[in-house]
Structures are given as C-alpha cells and as structure tokens.
Amino acid sequence: MQPQHPTETTFSLDQVSFSVPGRMLLKPLSLAFPAGKVCGLIGHNGSGKSTLLKMLGRHHPATSGQVRLNDRPVADWSNKAFARQVAYLPQQLPAAEGMTVRELVAIGRYPWHGALGRYGIEDREHVDEAMALVGLKPFAQRLVDSLSGGERQRAWIAMLVAQNSRCLLLDEPTSALDIAHQVEVLALIQRLSRERGLTVIAVLHDINMAARYCDHLVALRGGEVIAQGAPQAIMHGDVLQKIYGIPMGILPHPQGGAPVSFVY
C-alpha cells in the first residue's frame, strides 16, 4: 500500500464551530490536517480536543461551517463509504467480554461486507495481517479480557487496521496505560503511519509524548486553535505557557537534544 502524497489532506475545516445550549464548545476554526502523518490534538482539559475529534468522526455535527474529508463534505459520505475511509476509537472502549482477539479484529471488516455479507478469504487475510502488524498474531485465540492494558489497546488498534481505512481517529489512546505501555502504543501508531501511509489524528495529554511521536500538533485552548505546526515549533516555553496557562520551560534531551518540557 503506497503512502499518500504529502501535499494531500484528509480532513479540512472551514469556519467550523460547535455549540450546545448556552455554551460554545468550539469557536469558528479553519485548519487542514496533513495526510499520511501523525497529528496530535493537545491542550488543557475542556479545551475542545475530544469535541473536535468527534466532529471529524461524524459523532457531532458542526453547528456552523463545513468539515470536509478529501475535499468532500462529511455529510455527503454514506456510512459505509465513510467507514472505509475513517476508523474511530473512543476513549471509553466498548465491552469485549467473551471475545477472542481474532473475533474483535474481525469486526473491522464490517464496512466491507455488512451484517449479511460473507466473511471470506480476503477478510481473513486482512485480519491476519492486522494482528501481525501489532504483534498479536500469537494471541489470536486469547480472550481480549485476559490481555494486559497495552496488549488490549493494540488489539483495538488492530481492529482499526483491519478496517483498512486511510485515517485513524484516536481519543486519548494512552490515557489508561502506564508509561511503558504508552510508549509501546505510540511507537506502534507512529510505525503504522510511516509504513502504511496512514493519517492518524489523536487526542493526547502528555505534551512530551506528543512531541516525540507526532509529526504535527494542533493546540487548543478554550475552544480555539492557538498554535499548530511541527513539534519543534510548539516546544517553546512561551508557546506552552499560552497553551496550558502555567509557566513552562524547555530542556534539550541528553540523548539527541530533542526538546523536553517541564513546569516551573
């Protein structure tokens, strides 16, 4: 599978806002997400990160403006066609009680044949490939509930890979994991993007993890985009203070010199 051309975009937003009665959660914003890259949505709690991600995944319709996928309004896509392009993983994962890893990953094939379609050889090949890519093929017959936190998250990501979508939307994929499993999952996401040309848009809380594993960052505060760009452009004390509202500084990492943030 060839990576997408780097000048393409997956999602673009034109003066998009989102409101609930009595409150505007996202103020009008315009931006485009680069295709084939890992993009991190960062910012304080309540800044609008998850709301924006849910709008991209068509879980929230925009109050105003237009969200486009590949230059086409998201409302114009059928459910099946949209699912063949975009896969969404919520922060609160659905129950997988009694399901094996293979059974969970196979759910990703649903957009390609539907509830009454036959699960064929091509579907099995996609499932096997997805499990192999995330390192879970030896666990195919294990119950999902018996896996560690990192393994369970990899199983859900394998389901998205089996869906064969070009864009993955991940809402805080590392929030319930310890540091070792956070690194494991983010390294996997980065590798999948680079090897398969996938666009990944993920809500992330840890700015240092986001800077290490993302190609592009979009920072929100109070429902507004206040900074965006490569991690090197965001990892400055004054920019981080503007994003998080507290004094922050930057030190070079002793191995490689990559910028690492800290709180005063």
Please provide the spans of the model-predicted regions.
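The feature captures the beta-strand-to-loop junction immediately N-terminal to the Walker
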Residues: I42-H44
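Helix-to-loop junction immediately C-terminal to a conserved catalytic motif
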Residues: G57
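Conserved ABC transporter NBD signature motif
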Residues: G65-P73, F82
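Conserved ABC ATPase "signature" region
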Residues: A106, I121-F139
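Conserved ABC ATPase signature
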Residues: R118, L143-L147, E151
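Catalytic Walker B motif of ABC-type/P-loop ATPase nucleotide-binding domains
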Residues: L168-E172
